[in-house]
Amino acid sequence: MVFSCNSMEDLEQNWRKLSLSEREGPGCSLTKDDGVQAFSIAAKFFTKRALSIDVIAKTFTPLWRSRNGFKIKSLGDHKVLFTFDDKNDVDRILMSEPWSFDKHLVAMERYEKETPLHELKFEKTSLWVQIHGIPLRYMTVAVVEKICEVISDVLHLKDPKDADGGSVLRLKISIDMSLPLCRGWLVTLENDKQVWVSFKYERLPNLCYWCGHLTHVDKDCAIWIESEGTLRTDERQFGPSLRAPAFVLSRKDVIMVPGFYTDKKKAGPSNPSHKAMA
């Protein structure tokens, strides 16, 4: 059989088509103990500028504040591998997404050592989305989750209080980057009245206002390029309104006041001895 291979990646993907010799395997098995105990994040940088791992280190060191530091390895094609010796660092960094560099998105994945690096797709990223315009009677975390589950994977919060901003609720969602950001949702209430619920995203990096994708900016969009500059900016379907205002966790703005006679009933009847003394 004649087999042509243009790259090492082709060979890795098509080895099943080869007739392997005795020296080529199978025969070598690797166990968990053979691997290095480390925890990694693979990242893809969507900036068009050339990457410098020194600048990356200078940018993220004060933001991540890793106690034991971390290692950065360039993988080419604007991809980088961050390696830590503490799993808690990886968990904390991924929980704090989204991250940006040069104002452009940095898509991150927890890297498992069993996965070949070229198989990483960087198809999703996590964002905090604020939900605006929900009628007051429907302002619950359960309702917000129901709305968001239609358009994304909801990352359920450990503490529901993290979702409460008083007049607005928010959730952490995982979005498919091959799709445009969702601007909102037309919700039908039980009386058949329709209301528009707006989505606003926290710490949103640069995005394309023509198509709503996070992977490029306006000047690199196919819609703009194909128009040969004939489109007007007021024809853009997306805009700064997607950016959320600063989120402030709700303080204790609501308290439950017991009925007027509740405390009196708990206290019981007046002491008769006091009446006698009077």
Give the location of each predicted region:
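Classical protein tyrosine phosphatase
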Residues: 88, 92, 139-154, 216-222
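Nucleic acid-contacting regions in RNA/DNA-associated proteins
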Residues: 1-128, 133-140, 157-160, 185
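Well-ordered beta-strand positions in beta-sheet-rich domains
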Residues: 105, 128, 170-172, 184-186, ...
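Long, low-complexity intrinsically disordered regions
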Residues: 1-68, 165, 183-278
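The conserved glycine-aromatic submotif of the RRM
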Residues: 75-83, 163-172, 205
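Short, structured patches in soluble enzyme cores that scaffold and shape functional sites
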Residues: 131-133, 175-177, 201-203, 212
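BRCT (BRCA1 C-terminal) domain core and associated BRCT-interaction motifs
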Residues: 158-182
